[in-house]
Amino acid sequence: MDKIALIGDVHANLTALEAVLEDIEKRNISKIYCLGDIVSKSVNPDIVIDIIKEKCDVILKGNCDEIFSSERALTRQFWTRMKIGEKRAKFLRELPIMHEFYLSGKLIRLFHASPYSLEHIYNPEYNNHDKRYNNKIIINPMELFKNTDFIGKSKNDKIPDVIGYAHLHMPIIFKVEDKIIFNTGSVGASYNKGEATYTIVEGELNSQKNMNMSISNVSVYYNLEKEIKYIEESDIPTKDDIIAYLKN
């Protein structure tokens, strides 16, 4: 059986990423897929990008990766944009949107947020009442399985059996009709203080034969004070906001 670790929303949190990678290594997992949002929030985006490039077999683009790598980055994004430099920014801009593969006969499709954009959001826990996303809220979970131009799919392409996404920062796994949806939670910006989450899928990789497979979410605690020290010692102008976010 093959094991794949799926991580997302690292958000430049080096301490959390190191803790997760250590946990993945202890579990003898050799394949790691990243579902985007490598940068933003914390203060080591350059180091985190380099580690992700080295360790991950698949890397997808998140909404923050797109925004913070832009040559038109706004003032609040400028610190990160300067920190990562043009070479890393170009790497982020050129990341793919979607990845899919067979595991034990199931077609698994991965993206950062949705088949519509890098910002649309589906949140089953809170009835999707989030004013930040305005008209980018997905109500019906089956919409996550749609084939769209945004992810390079046509109506004639096979509909996946499993959807894995990030963006939400909340680890979830549930069935809808005959399908499965899971969210990786967040490595670097979890809603639980000092906790990083990721997902493990296990089965026969690249096999279209129906066999046993499993999906599980994992929580790892990291040294929050160490990450806060990184932030305090930096010259990022939004350090107070970042520390408050990580602590609360």
Show which residues each predicted segment covers.
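Active-site-proximal beta-strand elements of phosphoester/diester hydrolases
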Residues: D2-H11, L107-S114, I181-G185
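Core catalytic region of metal-dependent phosphoesterases/phosphodiesterases
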Residues: D2-R93
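Active-site environment of divalent metal-dependent phosphoester hydrolases
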Residues: H11-A16, S40-V43, C64-S70, Y116-S117, ...
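Glycine-rich phosphate-binding loop signature in dinucleotide/nucleotide-binding domains
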Residues: I24-I29, L103, K155-I159, I200
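Short acidic-hydrophobic surface loop/beta-edge motif
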Residues: I97-G105, F174-V176
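Active-site-proximal loop/helix segment associated with metal-binding centers of metalloenzymes
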Residues: A113-F150
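Hydrophobic, aromatic-enriched interface-forming segments
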Residues: I137-L144, F150-H169, I173-V176
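Acidic, His/Gly-rich catalytic cores of divalent-metal-dependent hydrolytic chemistry
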Residues: I173-N248
